[in-house]
Amino acid sequence: NESCNIYAPEYRQATYYSFFDVNNNGRNALDLAYSDIESAFSFFIENLNKDKPFIIAAHSQGALHAHRLINKMVDNTDLKNRLVCAYVIGYIIPEKYYEDLFPNTIKSSSFNDTGCIISWSSVVEGFKRNREKTLFWKPEGWSVELMSQRIVSTNPFSWTNDDGWYADDKNKSIINKAQNYDFTDRLSSEHTGAKKSIGLTRIQGFDCSLNNESGLLEARGALIDSIKKMKYFNGDLHPFDIMLFWGTLRQNIKDRIDAFI
């Protein structure tokens, strides 16, 4: 919100088990979720955007839907000329399908590329995902893809695609906070009034590298060591994909906007 107006509509997100359904119910749920996002994006473009440049930002299931949105609504339309960039974080983009998904949208390879896709999936150093497969959307429809195949990635500390280890002393990692919040908030269909905020993590500092085989973003250092001590943590930093890089991400948004205009 330092560089942009934010449009963040709610949508009917598919449940976690939609990704494991052996019938079509899971894919139908994901199609329904996507339809909300496409409708919201159309409303934004037609009523709120006023022909200005825009950024698409999404994480996890949201990133999966953003792949589809960019393919259908942006990549092959005049809107691509107004796309500053798209941060589609925390969901795999297999390298072999990139050209099918985004034939007219480049992969980012520097801090000030525009009209491009930026993606990463973060894990601790040496971690390999034990979940073998996941659903993936392609223009011809849904497929089941191996999680182990090489994915498109950018290192958010260097904004390059090489496998060097990088740190960013100016980065600030954050943690979500909430007052009077309990588990029922997750189940409520209404806003419960819990006051949510963010704060800086007590420990700062780590470095990261793109794994040359998988494309996963591996991280190590003091903050990562602290996260490893969390109960039930298995080595996948998926819940922290954005929080870890909050400071460098905010700066990069400024850099790409400056480059675009």
Question: What is each stretch, according to the model?
Answer:
Residues H67-N71:
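Short, hydrophobic alpha-helix immediately C-terminal to the catalytic nucleophile
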Residues N1-P53, E218-I261:
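Active-site catalytic motif of lipid deacylating hydrolases and related acyltransferases
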Residues E38-K50, K72-D225, A259:
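Surface cap/lid and interfacial helix-loop subdomains adjacent to catalytic sites
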Residues N5-E10, I55-I56, C85-V88, I118-S119:
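Structural recognition of the beta-strand scaffold that forms the well-ordered cores
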Residues T15-F19, L64-H65, K96:
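Short catalytic/ligand-binding loop motif for oxyanion handling, primarily in non-cytosolic enzymes
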Residues A58-A66:
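Gly/Ala-rich beta-loop-alpha elbow adjacent to hydrolase catalytic centers
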